[in-house]
């Protein structure tokens, strides 16, 4: 079993109802394992000695009518490895909860606030959690993706994972079965600045495309003409740049 020594934040935007998770660690591809979200239900980050089924059980509990606190209590009680687990969850009403088992690697801890929870283990100290919470609270006027990104950056600047850095991820869930945004820096020496770079490009290139995708209450159709035109360009020529130009043909 892999221990993910991680700092993360889960949150709900009170203006839009969007749910989100942002997470960073010194293990590759954290976005494939720790963040979970479900439309109309909630969002969670499961970490330390990761149990994906813990996050699934919490979201199932919320879907059945429990709030985040009740669902987390029930899921933790059923997990025999609870002392090794760490998880943060927020539900669709903005109720947040977190758990840090007594056998998580120090320093570990959590902070639950209005509509958010921050948690981390194997950190340099409590300043990481405090900095992330402060950054989230102080950015109330920003969109949820920006607030979560700012919280990750604050955690990184305060020390973060005491082993170093390797991957980071940010996920935003709306009312559809697919996320509004799911961006990752899967393996990078500076994953949080790399995630910021990817987020900047994604806002200009990916989010307009996702906005035009079929909705559960709307017919399927092509992306808007302006999005099609943009995406027909080589990546470096699009807004925000990125990617590479096409390879030149080499005559034989």
Question: Can you name each region flagged by the protein language model?
Answer:
Residues 1-252:
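N-terminal nucleophile
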């Amino acid at each position: 079993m892999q221990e993910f020594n991680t700092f993360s934040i889960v949150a709900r935007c009170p203006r839009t109802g969007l749910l989100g998770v942002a997470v960073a660690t010194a293990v590759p591809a954290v976005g494939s394992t720790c963040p979970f979200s479900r439309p109309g239900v909630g969002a969670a980050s499961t970490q330390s000695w990761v149990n994906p089924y813990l996050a699934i059980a919490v979201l199932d509990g919320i879907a059945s009518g429990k709030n985040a606190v009740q669902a987390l209590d029930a899921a933790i009680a059923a997990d025999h490895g609870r002392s090794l687990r760490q998880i943060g969850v927020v539900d669709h009403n903005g109720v947040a909860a977190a758990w840090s088992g007594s056998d998580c690697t120090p320093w570990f801890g959590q902070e639950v606030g209005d509509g958010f929870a921050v948690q981390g283990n194997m950190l340099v100290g409590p300043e990481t959690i405090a900095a992330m919470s402060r950054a989230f609270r102080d950015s109330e006027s920003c969109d949820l993706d920006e607030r979560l990104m700012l919280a990750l950056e604050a955690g990184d600047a305060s020390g973060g994972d005491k082993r170093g850095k390797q991957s980071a991820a940010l996920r935003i869930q709306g009312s559809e079965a697919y996320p509004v945004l799911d961006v990752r820096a899967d393996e990078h020496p500076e994953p949080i600045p790399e995630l910021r770079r990817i987020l900047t490009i994604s806002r200009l290139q990916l989010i307009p495309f996702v906005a035009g995708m079929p909705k559960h209450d709307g017919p399927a159709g092509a992306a808007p003409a302006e999005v099609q035109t943009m995406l027909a360009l080589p990546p470096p020529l699009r807004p925000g740049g990125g990617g590479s130009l096409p390879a030149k043909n080499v005559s034989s």
